[in-house]
UniProtKB/Swiss-Prot annotation:
It comes from Enterobacter sp. (strain 638). PANTHER family: PROTEIN FDHE. Necessary for formate dehydrogenase activity. NCBIfam families: FdhE, PRK03564.1. The keyword Transcription does not apply. The keyword Hydrolase does not apply. InterPro entries: FdhE-like_sf, FdhE_C, FdhE_central, FdhE_N, Formate_DH_accessory. This is Protein FdhE homolog. It is found in: Cytoplasm. Belongs to the FdhE family. The gene is fdhE.
Length: 309
């Protein structure tokens, strides 16, 4: 199954929801999203060997919350959604969508928020980014979107991505179209922007028991059935790993067919789990999966591969 985003004026009366309707897409709800992430990161930092790193990520997430409201985005995406639908492409495709300088403004504001909180190497990194030319920023953004991580140092990447993510999340939250599921391929990528997931989550509430993958860029969530590899869609050789026991709130779902894994979070086990924060706080599980011979099929926005990785 792939998910296409259909413009409002192309939705017919047949689109009415039934009792068993499963929302294929959950567009980002930005109110308090970054504050919740920052709070969860700070909570998970307690008694965690990665505590300093989690608190560092919390500072960035909190800055994102501030900058989000300081620099709102107003844009009409109706024409873009129609064009993308006609082409069968994600409306905010990271590989083709022209980037507005709005994200440069977001980056500079993030840096201004973070400078008083940073010291040492981290401060040097953001001061270096503050002086970067527009061309240099665009080159780094293009390299990250092309997964050419050797061209962007792993200490700069989280700050660049934080600004890009804010920009894409702002756009995604403004999409006036609705989504419907259609058969196709490439459901391992976000149907809104084409980026990859950070984790998947089995939810509670109105989407009780349903699994959604969470985009590491635009914060959209999209439905993928459980007991299926989110990377290759095979079902025959899946296994679930955890650091605790079978009731753990965070597990890794591995696939023997494609040799990858993606973490799966369970809100019914812990309602406070957060896609980015809980992934970052369980890097020990990633190390274990690597020892077992599996490759991660996702990237956390605070942890990018460095040169040679």
């Amino acid at each position: 199954m792939s998910i296409r985003i259909i413009p409002q004026d192309e939705l017919g009366s047949s689109e009415k929801r039934t009792a068993d309707y499963i929302p294929p897409l959950l567009f980002p709800r930005l109110k308090n999203l970054y504050n919740r992430r920052a709070e969860r990161l700070r909570e998970l930092a307690e008694n965690n060997p990665l505590g300093d790193f989690l608190r560092f990520a919390a500072l960035i997430a909190h800055a994102q919350e501030v900058v989000l409201y300081d620099h709102p985005l107003q844009i009409d995406l109706t024409a873009r959604i129609k064009e993308a639908n006609d082409q069968g492409k994600p409306p905010l495709d990271i590989h083709v969508l022209p980037r507005d300088k709005h994200w440069h403004t977001l980056l500079q504001s993030l840096i201004a928020e973070l400078k008083p909180e940073m010291s040492g190497p981290a401060l040097a990194v953001i001061e270096n980014l503050e002086k970067a030319s527009a061309l240099e920023l665009e080159e780094m953004a293009s390299a990250l979107f092309a997964a050419d991580f050797a061209l962007v140092s792993s200490d700069k990447a989280p700050f660049i991505w934080a600004a890009l993510s804010l920009y894409w999340a702002q756009m995604a939250s403004l999409i006036p179209g609705k989504a419907r599921a259609e058969y196709g391929e490439a459901r391992q990528f976000c149907p809104v922007c084409g980026s990859m997931p950070v984790t998947s989550m089995v939810q509670i509430g109105t989407t009780q028991g349903l699994r959604y993958l969470h985009c590491n860029l635009c914060e959209t969530e999209w439905h993928v059935v459980r007991i299926k590899c989110s990377n290759c869609e095979q079902t025959r050789d899946l296994n679930y790993w955890s650091l605790e026991n079978e009731n753990a709130a965070v597990k890794a779902e591995s696939c023997g067919d494609c040799g990858t894994y993606l973490k799966i979070l369970y809100q019914e086990k812990d309602p406070k789990v957060e896609a980015v924060a809980d992934d970052l706080a369980t890097l020990v599980l990633d190390a274990h999966m690597e020892q077992e011979g599996f490759a991660r099929s996702s990237i956390n926005p605070f942890l990018f591969p460095g040169e040679g990785e």
